Amino acid sequence: MELGMFRLNIYQPGGPIGALYPVEKILYHGRSQYQEIMILVLRGFGKTLVLDGLIQSTESDEHIYHETLVHPAMTVHPNPRRVLILGGGEGATLREVLKHNTVEKAVMVDIDGEVVRVAREYLPEWHQGAFDDPRAQVVIMDGFEYIKEAARRGEDFDVIIMDLTDPFGPKIAAKLYTKEAIGLVKSVLRSDGILVTQAGCAALFPEAFEKVYGSVKSLFAHAEEYGVWVPSFMYVNSFVFASDKYRLTDLSMEEVDRRLRERGVETRFYSGLRHYTLIGLGGIRLLEGRGS
């Protein structure tokens, strides 16, 4: 990687569709056991985490993605005390979870300890000390194996957040999007728990999205799509919310804002109004007559 232009290929590294980003500085470039890791400074976006040639998050808009991933599920649940995060090596998902004063324990499991190490050193704006919060437990382990062990131990969680690399992207997280894996995830979710997973982009990658959505829908009473435009990704990032008890629309805009206030949660993007905007923006299935 040299100073100049960074080419982001939306579909895959080396793919036919992409965009050029001016690179102002290379802060880190290395390779772990699992993937290539770069921390770049991109003009207009600031610090940027790139894994295997795909942008994961940028300083300018990571809060949009992470607040959208975390807070709908955390806010709809009336008392999220135990939370499991699969992936999320930058620590920003953990940061957002810990904003809720109901949380007693948050376990973050990431297979790549090198990503976590690099994030600790180069991305303090992301984790903001979350790794060292006494409520946080960081586990460097394959998420699939962790879930199996947690099930054997009889552990359970109120909210489980899957913050993995894209289902259409690198293969590192592919097995955690399968029906078998989602079934294991549900086995450590309390009966009134909520699962949320990022799911790529339903509009650009419908086959990958439908695989994720189908796996979730087959196992939960309710599965709902929502989404948010992430400028650095150049697309609407899709998410899937699932529960046997709760739905995204269970709370009014006013109730969302009230819960955020009561829990001491401060956000830059997410709010009661945005909660419903996210549901509308993620309505690809609804527009095509395939709603949940």
Curated annotation (Swiss-Prot):
Domain PABS, first and last residues per copy: 1-244
Similarity remark: Belongs to the spermidine/spermine synthase family.
Organism whose genome encodes this protein: Hyperthermus butylicus (strain DSM 5456 / JCM 9403 / PLM1-5)
Positions contributing to S-methyl-5'-thioadenosine binding: 35, 110, 142-143
UniProt keywords, alphabetically: Cytoplasm, Polyamine biosynthesis, Transferase
Disulfide bridge positions per record: none
Reactions the enzyme catalyzes: norspermine + S-adenosyl 3-(methylsulfanyl)propylamine = caldopentamine + S-methyl-5'-thioadenosine + 2 H(+); norspermidine + S-adenosyl 3-(methylsulfanyl)propylamine = norspermine + S-methyl-5'-thioadenosine + H(+); S-adenosyl 3-(methylsulfanyl)propylamine + spermidine = thermospermine + S-methyl-5'-thioadenosine + H(+)
Protein name as it appears in the record: Polyamine aminopropyltransferase 1
GO MF annotation list: spermidine synthase activity; sym-norspermidine synthase activity; thermospermine synthase activity
Free-text function comment from the UniProt entry: Involved in the biosynthesis of polyamines which are thought to support the growth of thermophilic microorganisms under high-temperature conditions. It seems that long-chain and branched-chain of polyamines effectively stabilize DNA and RNA, respectively. Catalyzes the irreversible transfer of a propylamine group from the amino donor S-adenosylmethioninamine (decarboxy-AdoMet) to norspermidine, spermidine and norspermine to yield norspermine, thermospermine and caldopentamine, respectively.
Annotated InterPro entries: PABS, PABS_CS, SAM-dependent_MTases_sf, Spermi_synthase, Spermidine_synt_N, Spermidine_synt_N_sf
NCBIfam families named in the record: PRK00811.1 (NF002010)
Subcellular location(s) of the protein: Cytoplasm
Presence of keyword Cytoplasm: yes
